[in-house]
From Swiss-Prot:
Has been proposed to contain 7 WD repeats. This prediction could not be reproduced. GO terms for biological process: angiogenesis; autophagy; cell-cell signaling; cellular response to estrogen stimulus; positive regulation of catalytic activity; positive regulation of endothelial cell migration; positive regulation of transcription by RNA polymerase II; regulation of actin cytoskeleton organization. The modification N-acetylmethionine is found at residue 1. It is found in: Nucleus; Cytoplasm; Cytoplasm, Cytoskeleton; Preautophagosomal structure. The modification Phosphoserine is found at residues 461, 480, 488, 838, 886, 898. Belongs to the BCAS3 family. This is BCAS3 microtubule associated cell migration factor. PANTHER family: BCAS3 MICROTUBULE ASSOCIATED CELL MIGRATION FACTOR, BREAST CARCINOMA AMPLIFIED SEQUENCE 3. There is a cross-link at residue 215 (Glycyl lysine isopeptide (Lys-Gly) (interchain with G-Cter in SUMO2)).
Amino acid sequence: MNETMATDSPRRPSRCTGGVVVRPQAVTEQSYMESVVTFLQDVVPQAYSGSPLTEEKEKIVWVRFENADLNDTSRNLEFHELHSTGNEPPLLVMIGYSDGMQVWGIPISGEAQELFSVRHGPVRAARILPAPQLGAQKCDNFAEKRPLLGVCKSIGSSGTTPPYCCVDLYSLRTGEMVKSIQFKTPIYDLHCNKRILVVVLQEKIAAFDSCTFTKKFFVTSCYPCPGPNMNPIALGSRWLAYAENKLIRCHQSRGGACGDNIQSYTATVLSAAKTLKSGLTMVGKVVTQLTGTLPSGVTEDDVALHCNSRRSPLVPGIITVIDTETVGEGQVLVSEDSDSDGIVAHFPAHEKPVCCMAFNTSGMLLVTTDTLGHDFHVFQILTHPWSSSQCAVHHLYTLHRGETEAKVQDICFSHDCRWVVVSTLRGTSHVFPINPYGGQPCVRTHMSPRVVNRMSRFQKSAGLEEIEQELTSKQGGRCSPVPGLSSSPSGSPLHGKLTSQDSYNNFTNNNPGNPRLSPLPSLMVVTPLAQIKQPMTLGTITKRTGPYLFGAGCFSIKAPCKVKSPPQISPSKSMGGEFCVAAVFGTSRSWFANNAGLKREKDQSKQVVVESLYIISCYGTLVEHMIEPRPISTAPKISDDTPLEIMTSPRASWTLVRTPQWNELQPPFNANHPLLLAAEAVQYYQLLLAGSLPPGSPGPITRHGSYDSLASDHSGQEDEEWLSQVEIVTHTGPHRRLWMGPQFHFKTIQTSGQTTVISTSSSVLQSHGPSDTPQPLLDFDTDDLDLNSLRIQPVRSDPVSMPGSSRAVSDRRGVSTVTDAASGTFDRSVTLLEVCGSWPEGFGLRHMSSMEHSEEGLRERLADAMAESPSRDVVGSGTELQREGSIETLSNSSGSTSGSIPRNFDGYRSPLPTNESQPLSLFPTGFP
């Protein structure tokens, strides 16, 4: 019986790490009435209900999903194997307690594995440092000690420093402390990548080199934020974004935030309330002036402005992006006297102070939020090698959460950057659909497993994008040349919400002639398609679906398992991050919980459109949510532009919170510990790329075997230049040729051997016999040509299909085809001279022998040329496209281009006229 209970238990000890292994548990979805009953049970104290108390849990202060060597897909060779299962990167979860911290790893198998656990007092921030990026002049001084863990705890290693003023670096291989960085002011957060370790202080940022941990640069001009992030920053693979306290005109980038133009019923009511409040405030100020507290004519704002007159006032909502590689050592100062070395972008993002920000995986997109939490902005940063003032910042999306205030604590992107999840202190995660290039999210963009192009093939071939831009320009839109309505996002009419538009954006700083700013997709206002809410009370996991207030989706309420009920505190008013939430996208791991007997290979046969969303809350429960996008149910007809709605459903949960009875799991670890194996694999790959790998050195030991076979092919001296031999294809061929569209006309040019008649009334008449020297048509006097008498009528042809086969070149030498754009305007005389060319040498002598077959052969060839069939190629493989000046001609590759006069055929395969009284009726007497 005990063995059965041990087998069914979701927890068991790990063999390789010695920690605890937690199996995923299937989530049962309750009905609406069951959710209400569960909610009432949670509200009623357990003393009245008489239910037994569950085991005591430790208090969680913060939660975080970490990126380290364990899930580094770019440098870990374990994830480079193709067409094999089990190579998806694991999830790495870090939990901070009031006494210590804990690290979990959730591989693709679904069993959460405890990797690290310690109790040494409160921990404010912690990071697992990835292996540094090596170079020709960069060596890792701590290679033998890695992986390293950076911890900011209440009591530092020295014990004499103030609380949270020290960063201690511990080796997870040996367990010793290898470095300690002291500060005079408290530390609020830690960030790291392959290049630097960033320590976030109040209004300051300090960056240290990842190889030596010596100070690289520091920033002292950060704008303070009331919380939860006292100094919000975003660290990508190379760029660092932070909130600047001033806007410097000479460094300001082109573009920036646009107005949101959102005015719902709730916003109208709140605006009226604010107006009433401001009116009452003015009445109070008048009463104060009459009583003599303040002198007449002086307000509190004037007093505050007078107090700050000694220094320039701080400006909220400004973002500065710097390049951590090119920025100079020492202080990074953005001022009018400083140069722009290392400054990537400098632009206004919000009116209020910035609360949270995050880069996507590529570093091109930046999401920012302010302290109000109504709207979140998505920017696309297009750099310029000259300076930050030439950088283009495109405001792609405004993600509208609602009209109530909420502070954002976490932002995450999906791996393909088509979904953004923003979590607030209220315990709600908002799911927004976006596109990496902007534009309206729809069925075409989000119902495919892969990212689609910005325009479909139909839109490209039909020219819909150009038509839309033309209509927009006529209406004075983003492409309007009118001053003030520039092509920049900041010139949009929606920009009226920003009160300081003149100071933030001007026509000079947003030049419509900037090629990086036009054409741009219009600013899109996107509402969340789903809200995944963590409840204010503790109870069993429940779900409630229904139409969402702002979006066309469904929203769910999920709660973790029942624990000891704390005092009922509103999450929005909780202090110290008590209601913390973190989210991340990843491969589904619920297959084992829902189908215990199903193999992984069979479950992975179905390709999902969206990866699973994992959310962990301060209750220590990790829940996997499935996201299923679909066309909106209210749409009468489904097309590519149909709006979206999504359904979310919980699939599996892991209870990761520890109890006081759990043992600690501290280094030194075994050689087969996942963190140690990952560090060895990444270090081996770094040495392999740098070419400093000792000969005969064995590869790292991994969970899936050695990588000697993978690395042996690229370790020799003869393969040092293998990268230069790689061929890449940046684009595929066109699905149809440009000349196949209805905008192009096809005209047939005929040749004449003996007599060429321009028109019946023309004075130009060239006649020669067989023995005469042929006169080239290019020798004609252009002033004498009566082109108006030709009466050339344009012929509009239907779009033709891509040629499937080609005829022999020898069968085509009698006809030359001219391609003419219908929409273009050009001189007809120039076209005639360029198209006709010159007569071949010895034309009359060589063609006398076949004179009797010329007329019938010409009819057949002209009829074949006009046939729009894939089997009969109009332009054949022997025909090449030549461009002379502004005219494109299709000439034979044999090199003999015959000059002739265009002719208009009224019927398909109609018999050719032979009466010479007609203008274009003559045929050559000899033809090859």
